Amino acid sequence: MGTGDPGGAPRLTHFDEHGNAAMVDVSAKAETERVATAEALVSMRPETFALIESGGIAKGDVLGVARIAGIMAAKRTADLIPLCHPLALSRVAVDFALLPDRPAVRIEATVTLKGRTGVEMEALTAVSVAALTLYDMCKAVDRGMTIGGIRLLHKSGGKSGTYRAGDEA
């Protein structure tokens, strides 16, 4: 949401004055360093986790393939989300934390750009597609895996400033 009226009342930015969907015009915005980090969690059976950890999944390197899928997805966000701007991203990093006590894999993506619009959707798309890829690679042994906890952890740059999950309360 942005503030579209003089009183500063929140409004959805992807709609014009008639309520029609519209891509936001960012041409007047200053180019600044934009960074966003998102996360997702894939929960699974302990046996599935052990196979991922040991590299025993028949399809191959689960985390390596999921990392590449997440990076590719971040670069293709504008093709997937209708009103996102196509962006020349500076950096996309996709990392994994193995959580044996849960058992789960936590996925984190950080996207960087010097530009006129944020990269939150690119980071969220990266973790989403990385999670879907992990599911695809492992579904032969565990169709009961769950994907959840997809959220923005941090964003900085631009007019709206810095956001950190948990700071909004």
From Swiss-Prot:
CDD domains in the cross-refs: MoaC_PE
GO BP terms, alphabetized: Mo-molybdopterin cofactor biosynthetic process
Keyword Lyase carried by entry: yes
Catalytic residue positions: D136
Record keywords, A-Z: Lyase, Molybdenum cofactor biosynthesis
Record flagged with keyword Lyase: yes
Enzyme Commission no: 4.6.1.17
Main EC class the enzyme belongs to: lyase
Reactions accelerated catalytically: (8S)-3',8-cyclo-7,8-dihydroguanosine 5'-triphosphate = cyclic pyranopterin phosphate + diphosphate
Quaternary context: Homohexamer; trimer of dimers.
Similarity annotation: Belongs to the MoaC family.
Function comment: Catalyzes the conversion of (8S)-3',8-cyclo-7,8-dihydroguanosine 5'-triphosphate to cyclic pyranopterin monophosphate (cPMP).
Protein name from the UniProt record: Cyclic pyranopterin monophosphate synthase
